[in-house]
Amino acid sequence: MTERAGLRLHDTAAGAVRDFVPLREGHVSIYLCGATVQGLPHIGHVRSGVAFDILRRWLMARGFDVAFIRNVTDIDDKILNKAAAAERPWWEWAATYERAFTAAYDALDVLPPSAEPRATGHVTQMVELIERLIERGHAYAGGGDVYFDVLSYPDYGQLSGHKVDDVHQGEGVATGKRDQRDFTLWKGAKPGEPSWPTPWGRGRPGWHLECSAMARTYLGAQFDIHCGGMDLIFPHHENEIAQSRAAGDGFARYWLHNGWVTMGGEKMSKSLGNVLAIPTMLQRVRPAELRYYLGSAHYRSMLEFSDIALQDAVNAYVGVEEFLHRVRSRAGVVVVGDWTPRFAAALDDDLSVPIALAEIHHTRAEGNRALDAGDHDAALQSASSIRAMMGILGCDPLDERWESRDETSAALAAVDVLVQAELENRQKAREERNWALADEIRNRLKNAGIEVTDTADGPQWLLGGDGK
């Protein structure tokens, strides 16, 4: 079933749900702000990936060719500070946690992006964008930095609703700024930090500049949808719009923002110390169950984490899984069929996943009744529809990828028990100042392909390479 009609999406810029009409018929271009790879991914990070993976899967199922770009911010103040505190090269720190994010996305079967550009690989395009802004009178150099002149762009604030007079960029006081409402495009070089040559001296890119340059490189001067967390609306996305459109680009036509994962009403974040890392969560539930949970709320809603809510999601997923296994054992092979009209109507209405899930569970109830009555044909039809609908949500229990992931998750849980024991021995050796033994344990883990990183939250481990 691949008709292309009726999709409506909530556009943050319009403040309303709009009919989705792509720039090119049959093609959709999407840019998702990806991770700043400073530490282990937690469920707040990955919720965005799951939410917009559902959008991508639905568009593809509707017959669209989707170009999906998700960037990696691999140069940033937080990365530099954390790497310096750990006495490790910044690029090694970024690469380590980029692998951790990739592993998290893979574990939850988030489809790989069409391209995944790193900020450090696109400095040339960033410099070219700054040059265009300076030529057009929207940017200026000062004190070794380059800034965007906010007052030069009359439409500033339209996405977020901020009035120019009330703007605070959160960058602190900078001597080179003409106006403290201006934001940094390029940061002048500092001792010990990475830098690149430019017409304004050596330095590194500002955060907002990176996404504008990478989106243009891969999707062109104008594209369909820009996605990200609602915390990025201001200043990040507001500044992206300003610098891109001031440079003459149309930029994104629709803006979609997902809600936070909260705990006790507070946004999940490392600074608050209330994060739940993906590796930790996958010791508690299976990958498919975690994906089901993260995708179960409407993408624009806050997702309040609790053990009860997580278990409710697990129970709901297991109910679907058990029904499909029951049908398969009694009626034979369950193929992927067609979704129901009510499921399609739900996703066409701004990706209303809770309503779509209600339709899945309604179909499951019908299928169970048919199976109990001995009507295997009707039960198979229900099961086939459920496979199609759960597949759109990325968690079809009968997909062979999930069965292999369940086995991998169990294996990783066993490995974690062994690694944690080694890390406890290493910590004891360090407390006793037995540095030789501590190094021996770390090297033993490294030779087994396990990378250990000492963080403020204690040692963290990742499967690295082949141990060579």
From Swiss-Prot:
Enzyme class name: ligase
Binding-site list for ATP: K270
Motif ('KMSKS' region): 267-271
Residue span of motif 'HIGH' region: 35-45
SUPFAM superfamilies xrefs: Anticodon-binding domain of a subclass of class I aminoacyl-tRNA synthetases, Nucleotidylyl transferase
Any GO molecular function: zinc ion binding
Record's subcellular location: Cytoplasm
Cofactor binding note of this UniProt entry: Binds 1 zinc ion per subunit.
Keywords: Aminoacyl-tRNA synthetase, ATP-binding, Cytoplasm, Ligase, Metal-binding, Nucleotide-binding, Protein biosynthesis, Zinc
Catalysed reactions listed for this entry: tRNA(Cys) + L-cysteine + ATP = L-cysteinyl-tRNA(Cys) + AMP + diphosphate
EC number(s) on file: 6.1.1.16
One record GO biological process: cysteinyl-tRNA aminoacylation
Cited InterPro entries: Cys-tRNA-ligase, Cys-tRNA-synt_Ia_DALR, Cys-tRNA/MSH_ligase, Rossmann-like_a/b/a_fold, tRNA-synt_1_cat_dom, tRNAsynth_Ia_anticodon-bd
Record family assignment: Belongs to the class-I aminoacyl-tRNA synthetase family.
Family annotation (NCBIfam families): cysS
Name of this chain's protein: Cysteine--tRNA ligase
Primary gene name: cysS
